[in-house]
Amino acid sequence: MIGPDGCGFDMRSPSEMEADDARRESYEAAHAPRMAVTSRIRRVVQPEGGYLPLFLFDEVCLADPVPLFAFEDVPADVTGLAVDYLSRVARGVPARDAFRVPLAGARLVGRSADAERLLAMVDGFSDRSVRAACLLCGFDAASRRGPARWRAGRVIDPGPATVYNVRRMVARTLRFMDRVGPVVWEGFTFDGGYTDRVTSGDGDLLTADGLWDLKVSRWPPNPTYTLQLLVYWRLGLHSTHPEYLRVRHLGLYNARSDTMWSVPVARIGADAVRAVERDVIGYADGL
Protein backbone atom coordinates (compact mmCIF):
# COMPACT_ATOMS: atom_id res chain seq x y z
CA MET A 1 0.00 0.00 0.00
CA ILE A 2 1.20 3.56 -0.77
CA GLY A 3 1.23 5.71 2.34
CA PRO A 4 0.26 9.39 2.62
CA ASP A 5 3.88 10.37 1.96
CA GLY A 6 3.79 8.75 -1.48
CA CYS A 7 6.36 6.09 -0.57
CA GLY A 8 5.90 2.35 -0.94
CA PHE A 9 5.34 1.86 2.77
CA ASP A 10 2.21 1.90 4.89
CA MET A 11 2.70 4.92 7.15
CA ARG A 12 -0.56 4.49 9.06
CA SER A 13 -0.59 3.92 12.78
CA PRO A 14 -1.16 0.37 14.10
CA SER A 15 -4.66 1.31 15.24
CA GLU A 16 -5.55 2.57 11.76
CA MET A 17 -4.24 -0.63 10.16
CA GLU A 18 -6.17 -2.79 12.62
CA ALA A 19 -9.35 -0.85 11.94
CA ASP A 20 -8.85 -1.27 8.20
CA ASP A 21 -8.23 -5.01 8.59
CA ALA A 22 -11.42 -5.31 10.63
CA ARG A 23 -13.40 -3.50 7.95
CA ARG A 24 -11.96 -5.74 5.25
CA GLU A 25 -12.75 -8.92 7.20
CA SER A 26 -16.28 -7.69 7.80
CA TYR A 27 -16.72 -6.97 4.10
CA GLU A 28 -15.36 -10.37 3.08
CA ALA A 29 -17.66 -12.14 5.53
CA ALA A 30 -20.65 -10.23 4.26
CA HIS A 31 -19.80 -10.93 0.62
CA ALA A 32 -18.57 -14.51 0.95
CA PRO A 33 -20.19 -17.04 -1.38
CA ARG A 34 -23.63 -18.01 -0.09
CA MET A 35 -24.78 -21.51 -0.77
CA ALA A 36 -26.60 -24.64 0.32
CA VAL A 37 -24.93 -27.34 2.38
CA THR A 38 -24.31 -29.58 -0.62
CA SER A 39 -22.72 -26.77 -2.62
CA ARG A 40 -20.57 -25.63 0.28
CA ILE A 41 -19.11 -29.03 1.10
CA ARG A 42 -18.07 -29.62 -2.52
CA ARG A 43 -15.73 -26.64 -2.21
CA VAL A 44 -14.05 -27.81 0.98
CA VAL A 45 -10.55 -29.30 0.89
CA GLN A 46 -10.61 -31.95 3.60
CA PRO A 47 -7.72 -33.68 5.36
CA GLU A 48 -6.79 -37.14 4.10
CA GLY A 49 -9.70 -39.49 4.73
CA GLY A 50 -12.02 -36.58 5.47
CA TYR A 51 -13.08 -34.83 8.65
CA LEU A 52 -15.29 -37.84 9.41
CA PRO A 53 -13.52 -40.95 8.02
CA LEU A 54 -15.61 -43.91 6.96
CA PHE A 55 -13.61 -46.29 9.17
CA LEU A 56 -15.34 -44.74 12.19
CA PHE A 57 -18.70 -46.02 10.92
CA ASP A 58 -20.35 -49.37 11.57
CA GLU A 59 -21.62 -51.02 8.36
CA VAL A 60 -24.69 -53.24 8.08
CA CYS A 61 -25.92 -54.77 4.81
CA LEU A 62 -29.68 -55.40 4.81
CA ALA A 63 -29.32 -57.69 1.77
CA ASP A 64 -32.53 -57.39 -0.22
CA PRO A 65 -32.56 -60.61 -2.30
CA VAL A 66 -34.34 -58.90 -5.22
CA PRO A 67 -31.72 -57.34 -7.55
CA LEU A 68 -31.93 -54.07 -9.45
CA PHE A 69 -31.33 -53.48 -13.13
CA ALA A 70 -27.80 -52.31 -13.90
CA PHE A 71 -28.85 -49.44 -16.20
CA GLU A 72 -30.99 -46.35 -15.59
CA ASP A 73 -31.77 -43.63 -18.11
CA VAL A 74 -32.14 -40.60 -15.82
CA PRO A 75 -29.37 -38.78 -13.90
CA ALA A 76 -28.37 -40.36 -10.60
CA ASP A 77 -29.36 -37.29 -8.57
CA VAL A 78 -32.87 -37.41 -10.03
CA THR A 79 -33.18 -41.10 -9.18
CA GLY A 80 -32.18 -40.34 -5.60
CA LEU A 81 -34.65 -37.50 -5.27
CA ALA A 82 -37.48 -39.59 -6.70
CA VAL A 83 -36.75 -42.38 -4.21
CA ASP A 84 -36.62 -39.87 -1.34
CA TYR A 85 -39.81 -37.99 -2.22
CA LEU A 86 -41.83 -41.09 -3.11
CA SER A 87 -40.76 -42.68 0.19
CA ARG A 88 -42.24 -39.67 1.97
CA VAL A 89 -45.47 -39.99 0.02
CA ALA A 90 -45.63 -43.68 0.94
CA ARG A 91 -45.41 -42.71 4.61
CA GLY A 92 -48.39 -40.40 4.31
CA VAL A 93 -46.79 -37.05 3.47
CA PRO A 94 -48.98 -35.16 0.95
CA ALA A 95 -47.38 -35.21 -2.50
CA ARG A 96 -47.38 -31.41 -2.66
CA ASP A 97 -45.36 -31.26 0.55
CA ALA A 98 -43.01 -34.06 -0.45
CA PHE A 99 -42.25 -32.41 -3.81
CA ARG A 100 -42.20 -28.82 -2.55
CA VAL A 101 -38.61 -28.18 -3.66
CA PRO A 102 -39.04 -29.15 -7.34
CA LEU A 103 -42.38 -27.33 -7.40
CA ALA A 104 -40.59 -24.19 -6.23
CA GLY A 105 -37.92 -24.75 -8.87
CA ALA A 106 -40.54 -25.05 -11.59
CA ARG A 107 -41.99 -21.69 -10.56
CA LEU A 108 -38.55 -20.11 -10.84
CA VAL A 109 -38.16 -21.24 -14.46
CA GLY A 110 -41.75 -20.50 -15.50
CA ARG A 111 -42.84 -24.13 -15.72
CA SER A 112 -45.44 -24.29 -12.95
CA ALA A 113 -48.15 -25.62 -15.24
CA ASP A 114 -45.95 -28.54 -16.31
CA ALA A 115 -45.01 -29.28 -12.71
CA GLU A 116 -48.63 -29.23 -11.56
CA ARG A 117 -49.59 -31.62 -14.34
CA LEU A 118 -46.86 -34.02 -13.24
CA LEU A 119 -47.77 -33.67 -9.57
CA ALA A 120 -51.35 -34.69 -10.34
CA MET A 121 -50.00 -37.98 -11.69
CA VAL A 122 -48.12 -38.86 -8.49
CA ASP A 123 -50.70 -41.08 -6.88
CA GLY A 124 -48.79 -44.14 -5.70
CA PHE A 125 -46.32 -46.50 -7.33
CA SER A 126 -47.80 -47.14 -10.73
CA ASP A 127 -45.49 -46.76 -13.71
CA ARG A 128 -47.15 -43.45 -14.56
CA SER A 129 -46.68 -42.14 -11.02
CA VAL A 130 -42.99 -43.07 -10.86
CA ARG A 131 -42.31 -41.57 -14.29
CA ALA A 132 -44.06 -38.34 -13.29
CA ALA A 133 -42.04 -38.20 -10.06
CA CYS A 134 -38.75 -38.51 -11.95
CA LEU A 135 -39.71 -35.79 -14.44
CA LEU A 136 -40.88 -33.52 -11.63
CA CYS A 137 -37.58 -34.00 -9.78
CA GLY A 138 -35.84 -32.52 -12.79
CA PHE A 139 -36.92 -29.08 -11.53
CA ASP A 140 -35.20 -29.62 -8.18
CA ALA A 141 -31.91 -28.12 -9.37
CA ALA A 142 -33.58 -24.83 -10.26
CA SER A 143 -34.61 -24.42 -6.63
CA ARG A 144 -31.47 -25.68 -4.90
CA ARG A 145 -28.83 -24.30 -7.27
CA GLY A 146 -30.64 -21.46 -8.99
CA PRO A 147 -32.53 -21.17 -12.29
CA ALA A 148 -29.28 -20.77 -14.22
CA ARG A 149 -28.28 -24.32 -13.24
CA TRP A 150 -31.50 -25.85 -14.58
CA ARG A 151 -31.47 -27.31 -18.07
CA ALA A 152 -34.61 -28.20 -19.99
CA GLY A 153 -34.58 -31.73 -21.36
CA ARG A 154 -31.95 -33.01 -18.92
CA VAL A 155 -34.42 -35.56 -17.57
CA ILE A 156 -36.12 -37.79 -20.12
CA ASP A 157 -39.22 -39.90 -19.60
CA PRO A 158 -37.74 -42.87 -17.71
CA GLY A 159 -37.92 -46.35 -19.16
CA PRO A 160 -39.10 -49.59 -17.53
CA ALA A 161 -35.76 -50.45 -15.87
CA THR A 162 -35.53 -47.05 -14.18
CA VAL A 163 -39.15 -47.19 -13.05
CA TYR A 164 -38.60 -50.66 -11.60
CA ASN A 165 -35.42 -49.61 -9.78
CA VAL A 166 -37.02 -46.52 -8.26
CA ARG A 167 -40.00 -48.54 -7.05
CA ARG A 168 -37.74 -51.24 -5.56
CA MET A 169 -35.48 -48.70 -3.85
CA VAL A 170 -38.53 -47.02 -2.32
CA ALA A 171 -39.52 -50.40 -0.88
CA ARG A 172 -36.00 -50.86 0.51
CA THR A 173 -36.06 -47.37 2.02
CA LEU A 174 -39.37 -48.03 3.76
CA ARG A 175 -38.00 -51.26 5.21
CA PHE A 176 -34.91 -49.39 6.41
CA MET A 177 -37.09 -46.73 8.06
CA ASP A 178 -39.04 -49.43 9.87
CA ARG A 179 -35.76 -50.80 11.17
CA VAL A 180 -34.31 -47.53 12.52
CA GLY A 181 -37.54 -45.68 13.30
CA PRO A 182 -39.70 -44.16 14.47
CA VAL A 183 -39.07 -41.31 12.07
CA VAL A 184 -39.80 -38.01 13.82
CA TRP A 185 -38.96 -35.53 11.03
CA GLU A 186 -38.57 -35.96 7.28
CA GLY A 187 -37.01 -33.11 5.32
CA PHE A 188 -35.51 -31.50 8.43
CA THR A 189 -34.18 -27.93 8.31
CA PHE A 190 -31.83 -25.78 10.40
CA ASP A 191 -33.67 -22.54 11.10
CA GLY A 192 -31.50 -20.30 13.24
CA GLY A 193 -28.36 -22.30 12.47
CA TYR A 194 -27.50 -21.06 8.98
CA THR A 195 -24.52 -18.77 8.42
CA ASP A 196 -23.10 -16.53 5.72
CA ARG A 197 -21.29 -19.58 4.32
CA VAL A 198 -24.19 -22.02 4.58
CA THR A 199 -27.44 -20.21 3.93
CA SER A 200 -29.78 -23.10 3.16
CA GLY A 201 -30.09 -26.84 3.17
CA ASP A 202 -32.35 -29.60 4.39
CA GLY A 203 -31.75 -33.21 5.30
CA ASP A 204 -33.60 -36.46 4.84
CA LEU A 205 -34.78 -37.87 8.14
CA LEU A 206 -34.44 -37.73 11.89
CA THR A 207 -35.32 -40.68 14.08
CA ALA A 208 -35.72 -40.55 17.85
CA ASP A 209 -31.94 -40.53 18.31
CA GLY A 210 -30.38 -40.49 14.84
CA LEU A 211 -29.77 -38.21 11.86
CA TRP A 212 -29.82 -40.04 8.52
CA ASP A 213 -29.02 -39.13 4.94
CA LEU A 214 -30.32 -41.24 2.06
CA LYS A 215 -28.24 -42.08 -1.02
CA VAL A 216 -28.54 -44.20 -4.16
CA SER A 217 -24.90 -44.02 -5.25
CA ARG A 218 -23.23 -46.97 -6.93
CA TRP A 219 -20.16 -46.38 -4.77
CA PRO A 220 -19.39 -46.56 -1.03
CA PRO A 221 -19.71 -43.33 0.98
CA ASN A 222 -16.98 -40.78 0.30
CA PRO A 223 -15.65 -37.93 2.48
CA THR A 224 -18.15 -35.50 0.96
CA TYR A 225 -21.06 -37.67 2.11
CA THR A 226 -19.70 -38.04 5.64
CA LEU A 227 -18.91 -34.32 5.86
CA GLN A 228 -22.50 -33.60 4.87
CA LEU A 229 -23.68 -35.59 7.89
CA LEU A 230 -21.31 -33.76 10.21
CA VAL A 231 -22.39 -30.36 8.89
CA TYR A 232 -26.08 -31.28 9.26
CA TRP A 233 -25.55 -32.31 12.87
CA ARG A 234 -23.71 -29.14 13.85
CA LEU A 235 -26.18 -26.91 11.99
CA GLY A 236 -28.96 -28.66 13.86
CA LEU A 237 -27.37 -28.11 17.25
CA HIS A 238 -27.05 -24.40 16.47
CA SER A 239 -30.63 -24.20 15.19
CA THR A 240 -33.83 -23.42 17.05
CA HIS A 241 -35.03 -27.03 16.89
CA PRO A 242 -34.65 -29.09 20.09
CA GLU A 243 -34.95 -32.39 18.20
CA TYR A 244 -31.23 -32.26 17.39
CA LEU A 245 -30.30 -32.39 21.07
CA ARG A 246 -31.39 -36.03 21.11
CA VAL A 247 -29.20 -37.12 18.20
CA ARG A 248 -26.79 -39.83 19.34
CA HIS A 249 -25.61 -41.19 16.01
CA LEU A 250 -25.24 -40.11 12.38
CA GLY A 251 -25.94 -42.43 9.50
CA LEU A 252 -26.11 -43.03 5.77
CA TYR A 253 -28.43 -45.43 4.03
CA ASN A 254 -27.88 -46.43 0.41
CA ALA A 255 -31.01 -47.92 -1.11
CA ARG A 256 -29.10 -49.15 -4.17
CA SER A 257 -26.71 -51.33 -2.17
CA ASP A 258 -29.26 -51.75 0.66
CA THR A 259 -26.52 -50.90 3.15
CA MET A 260 -26.44 -48.61 6.17
CA TRP A 261 -23.45 -46.95 7.84
CA SER A 262 -23.71 -45.29 11.26
CA VAL A 263 -21.37 -43.64 13.75
CA PRO A 264 -22.05 -42.66 17.38
CA VAL A 265 -21.51 -38.93 17.79
CA ALA A 266 -19.38 -39.72 20.85
CA ARG A 267 -16.87 -41.32 18.46
CA ILE A 268 -16.34 -38.07 16.51
CA GLY A 269 -13.23 -36.13 17.54
CA ALA A 270 -13.60 -32.67 19.06
CA ASP A 271 -10.88 -31.27 16.78
CA ALA A 272 -12.81 -32.35 13.68
CA VAL A 273 -16.01 -30.82 15.02
CA ARG A 274 -14.25 -27.58 15.85
CA ALA A 275 -12.63 -27.34 12.41
CA VAL A 276 -15.90 -28.02 10.59
CA GLU A 277 -17.82 -25.48 12.64
CA ARG A 278 -15.19 -22.81 12.10
CA ASP A 279 -13.83 -23.46 8.61
CA VAL A 280 -16.76 -25.08 6.81
CA ILE A 281 -19.91 -23.66 8.39
CA GLY A 282 -18.47 -20.36 9.57
CA TYR A 283 -19.28 -20.25 13.27
CA ALA A 284 -16.90 -17.82 14.90
CA ASP A 285 -15.68 -19.89 17.81
CA GLY A 286 -16.34 -23.53 16.90
CA LEU A 287 -17.82 -25.83 19.53
Predicted regions and their residues:
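Active-site metal-binding core of divalent-cation-utilizing nuclease and nuclease-like domains
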Residues: 68-75, 179-206
